[in-house]
Amino acid sequence: MAGSLDQVPEIVRFLRTEGSRRQLFPAWTEEALRNLDGLNIDDIRVARPNGEIAGVIALWDQTAYKQSIVRGYSGWMRLAAPFLPRAGQHLRSAYASLICATSPEVFAGLLREICALASERRFDYLLIGLDARDPLLPVARGYRHYEYPSRLYLASWSNGGSTNEQLDHRPAYVDIATL
């Protein structure tokens, strides 16, 4: 189901509650959610299998200020160049953002919806970021994909004491749309 302005308070409550199961999850406010550049509230999808919110995901179009343009290919990639986007081509990419679900099954339904929306809007790629330990990752891996392994680093301007001590076993929240 598409999000709407009247759902924003409930969406924010869900994100704050369920999001706490991930490390580094943002402390969303209604104002912050309404003011994300390029993210329309109706691009948020909400899962309500039993009436209550069980999951949220958004399609965030940042093409107005963030683009990927193929500059060329080198090394072994030159061999595949005829099958890849042309040099100079703009890749229309959107981000799966605000990912928060109570279960992989709920996430699977939301991801299907957001993939369909991305296809309908003619995006070439849907970019998604998940921690390697995230129980939602196997669902995303079920789609044709390219993995780009990365490391998250925690930086601190003080001695980092309290932040470092709060890290635990929970998967990190990685929203690559905000990077």
Residue ranges of model-derived segments:
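Short amphipathic alpha-helix that is part of the acyltransferase structural core
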Residues: 1-31, 52-53, 94, 169-179
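Short loop/turn motifs at secondary-structure junctions and domain boundaries
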Residues: 35-39
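Short hydrophobic/aromatic beta-strand element in the GNAT-like acyltransferase core
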Residues: 41-46, 56
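Active-site/acyl-donor-binding loops of N-acyltransferases
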Residues: 1, 49, 55-179
